[in-house]
Amino acid sequence: FAAPFVSGGLAVIADYFEGQLGSKEIVDRLFATANKNGVYSDKAIYGQGLMDLGAATAPVGQVSAMLTGTLSGAMVPALFTGIQLTSPSFGDAVSNGVANQTIIFFDELDAPFRGAVENLTTDYRNQIVNLDGYEHMYQSTPQIIDSPDNVLEMSNYKNQNLSYGLISSMHLLEAQQDSNQFFTYFNKGNNSFVSHGINGSWALGIFQDKDLRYKSQLRSQFSNPWLNFSAGGTSFGSVYKFQHNLDVAFLISSGRNRFQANEVFGESNSSTVAMIELQPKNNMPSIQFGVLKENDSNLGLSGSGAFNGNGGQMTSFVGISDSISLFGGKFFSSLYVGNSPGTSNNEGMINSITDIQSSAFGMGFLKQSIFNSGDELLLSIDQPMRTESGEMNLRVPVYRTKERSVLFNSFGFTLRPSGREVHSKARYTSSFKNIGLSLTLGYKSDPYHIKSMEDYWYTALGFSIKI
């Protein structure tokens, strides 16, 4: 190296790393990253080789994230470090909370590389494809076999092979199709039921009412939201007569998270739910009590790498629901609230998560035989599961001194999203002989619980012909 060029290169490296490297580290880095290939390998002429500032300011080897407070402590690959959201309940809370926050990772020479914490978060809305108004592209074709002893329902979605010029890739629509394949079975003799690939509360809550049980369009709005975390698996349940005016239902469900709306890229997090439902027979609402155990997340909020540490999270919940005959139709409603106890972590960058309260609610009205014996009107309004309170506290490295000490930034933020999604929908269906028609009109405010997202209307018109 020529002395003036070396001096200039050292200054560039020192400035690039914000003065965090000592003089010896800078010189060692300059020599270690010099180009020693070809003619530059001749030490008699080029000494340490050709200075390469591009290589000197780029990571050397693997970039790692700290698990402890020192550079000599345990580290994990930065590539595997991040925060994932596989539930819509947090909305934009995490992305807002980490906005403008930075973090440093380290290469194999312990040089710091700065990045944005926000780039390490995977937002739920970036994992999904919005199919509102496109349900008719994959028409549900449930087959219900109803006998005196039992009821069997099997469903999948039939690809209509229509070209709508959607921005969304077709493979994501195919993934959405796969996620709607399920079966349910109800034994009328002993009041037991089993299902796979669907929220396990399909026969509980408002769905005790046989007029509502197989209204598949209501399931995503009125099923117990915590059972969505195991809806990709199998559920077993049974209803027992406890007293002459009280039945008690028991349910166990285990499987992966239904919120993996992007099945192509989503992780497979498994959860288990145990639930009891009290079913009074004196026109009183049903009450549900239950516990959700998630293996690798907290209500779908999970961390990996240096953000790991939320395994085995428990959530308790309670729900109340009812359906009554009113104005010649059925009025139905449900309300659910849950609590996830706080957690702390001695290693990693998530210091703690406080208690998280969450909620969901909905109400609707079903009226049949309005203009003819084969039509019905279904009105509903609901709020999907939403985080009502809770905080996350992070401790991330932001600076290292020339003496190799690491300085941390501790900060916390609310897990309550900026908005509250409310979904209103009206659906009219009618049939004449072998032809069926349906018209859906819906409105969403604060989609995904994000205030900055525009409210929108959607509509869908469909028809079917029985051959």
How would you describe each model-predicted region?
Residues 1-48:
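Hydrolase catalytic cores
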Residues 54-154:
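Secreted peptidase-domain scaffold signal
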Residues 115-235:
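Transmembrane beta-barrel domains of Gram-negative outer membranes and organellar outer membranes
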Residues 160-162, 180, 190-194, 242-248, ...:
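Outer-envelope beta-barrel architecture signal
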Residues 182-186, 236-240, 274-282, 318-324, ...:
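Residues on the lipid-exposed face of transmembrane beta-strands in outer-membrane beta-barrel proteins
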Residues 213-217, 221-226, 249-251, 264-268, ...:
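Outer membrane beta-barrel transmembrane domains
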Residues 219-223, 233-238, 244-279, 291:
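Glycine- and small hydrophobic-enriched segments that form the cores of compact globular domains
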Residues 447-467:
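Proline-poor, low-complexity alpha-helical tail modules
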